[in-house]
Amino acid sequence: LHIYVREGSGAKNLETLIKTMLDAGVCLDRCAFCTDDKHVEEIRKEGHISTCIRKAIALGVPVAKAYKMGSYQAAEFYGLKNYGAIGAGYRADIVFLDDLEQVRPLDVMKDGRILTEEDYAKDYSVPVPDELLHTVHVGEVTKEKIRLSCDGKTDVIQMNPHQIVTTHLVEEVPAENGYFKPDGVYNKICVVERHGKTGEIGVAPLKGFGVKGGAVATSVAHDSHNLIVAGDNDEDILAAIKGVEENQGGYVIASGGKVVDVLPLPICGLMS
């Protein structure tokens, strides 16, 4: 059994897991770090696995063990026999640091060569097959298709801060003429099948997202990557859905019945 201690953008579990294992005296030889999705701006600001190592050391993990969890043990778990250590027979992929506990990289060596600014500035773009640029197919989505019958208490999805695990609630939600009427507390969330296969749409009240005066939609939704949208009114929800389809993927913000901002991700609806 290998345990991956996760510390990403949506799910932050490192502090709880490390504290629990240290308190219980658990051997960390079968543990490694992972992020399981970390936003690029966070990677640029604070680092990637380096952040996990830094936090683990601050929580009391011995320095050498923290680095082993962030390198050798991870490579070992994945069967990457030539990675994760400095020695004969290992790839010369090395990070040079100025401080062990702060984990601040000074230089990076790849295959025995120190990388330069020119290496980072290279254009690594490649041709994109046309079929990968047309993957968002939702068809016509109307108000009728995103209605949710509601009379009294109903099932609600509760978001939890810094977690990807949600909580199932049964609560009284706002309704009008027998249908759920979203607001700033109880947003409406819709999952729209976007691969042109079934056209199915799932709808539910969402608590804890707190969008007011608009809607947010995205085609990045692990693991099936259907279109997910949440908002406090149907007009903006529909506008956001349409915006994602028109851009063939990405993140869309809608307000006042129209798209007000968009980050296009046209390659498979996932990448720029």
What role is predicted for each listed range?
Residues 1-5, 10-33, 42-58, 62-65, ...:
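Histidine/acidic residue-rich metal-binding segments in metalloenzymes
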Residues 36:
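Active-site glycine-centered loops adjacent to acidic/histidine catalytic or metal-binding residues
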Residues 44-60, 64-272:
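Active-site microenvironment of metallo-dependent hydrolases
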